[in-house]
Amino acid sequence: MVGPENSEKPTILIRGWLWFRDIPSKPLAKLRGVARQAIELAKDDPRRLIHSLKVGLTVTLVSLLYYLQPLYNNLGASAMWAVMTVVVVFEFSVGGTIGKCLNRGLATLAAAALALGANHLAILSGGENEPYVIGLFVFIQAVAMSFVRFFPKVKARYDYGMLIFILTFSLVSISGLRINEVIKLAQARFVTIVIGASTCLAVCILIYPVWAGEDLHKYVGKNISQLGNFLEEHMDQCFKRSSDARIEITKPSISNLNSILVDSKGREETLANLAGWEPGHGQFMFRHPWKQYLKIGNLTRQCACRLEPINDYLNSNIQAPQEIQCKIQEAFSESGKTLKELAWAIETMTKPSSANPHIENLKTASENLKILLRSGIKGDESDILQIIPIAVVMTDMVSSVEQIGDAVNELSLMAKFKSKTGNGVEGESEIGHDKNCIEIGMAEIPSLSVAIDERTEFSADEQILI
């Protein structure tokens, strides 16, 4: 007869064996997961893999300064600074690499020159006072440069240079206390940094260059296009006519706009900062108006913010009169067409002349909605009162779209976009409204009135519409 204690032993042994058997499979599963993630990253943007290969090539090239004896005899152990320079300054984009190279080179040159001056003053002060004078200079420059880093403009463009200045000044000035040939030390450090930075620039620019300005240009156009697609296509699906001629409202999702509202600001500012370091390339001339892209991006985010209260309205159970629904749908459609035309103008770097008709139609749709609300509409008084704030938001959204159009026009003038040729795509898509909605003209709208209590209070914008 087997007791309880004896019956537990085989169970423990089986569990132990299963645990021991699964030990090799766990690392393999993790490795497979990492491999899948690496493949996805490479497929998502093949430039990442190319950048990694470029970094490996550059590090190998500058390592020859240390491997080859003739080069090592001239530079000595300072040749290792070339490898360190490549590791810290080689960035994904050309603008990032140029910015770091210039920051490192100029900061090293300025700090080394000042450190030599500090050493000379320390020598003049006497042998016993020399360490104290050097320590005072190191303290003053470290405090000053660290504080200067907090300036917003310095933080954005020259923060890396400030760090290199502190490092170089401290190394050269302190080394002067123990090394007699401090000038040779500073010279070797500067030469190796120039060699490393030059190799980085050559590989970064000549082999599959990644331009931050081009990425910014495409990113801003993509955001405007996403917003236009949402307004024209997705919102159009929110208005579907049922068999009893009532307009049903589906619940749209604004998850596609999260990238515009949340992530775009930081990315645009980073790309614009890096693009400022880049020379003229391709269709982008020297001193291209990159800051104008930031203005367009801000206006795009403001327009996207207008959709949140409209989304709440579409998710509600309010059944507005058919006339108002048609006018809101018309404003959505024209806003989407306008934004898509503006995005196309940015992507192709052509003047946005084809967007002008849509902007005029958008203004007309907005005015029609205002006139329709002023004329009075039959329906539930509470529903109509809740629609008035939505109409105000619609007016603000129309204004945002017009501002985006003005900003894109300014960009086309500043960047000298080419005019559209006769072979260009000039076609205008038909307005996809319901036939009954299009037939509703302002001349056909009867003079209706809504019994609104005179004691009802409205906001300033709502009073303008009423």
Identify the residue ranges that each predicted region occupies:
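Extracellular/lumenal glycan-associated surfaces
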Residues: 91-92, 306-308, 400-402
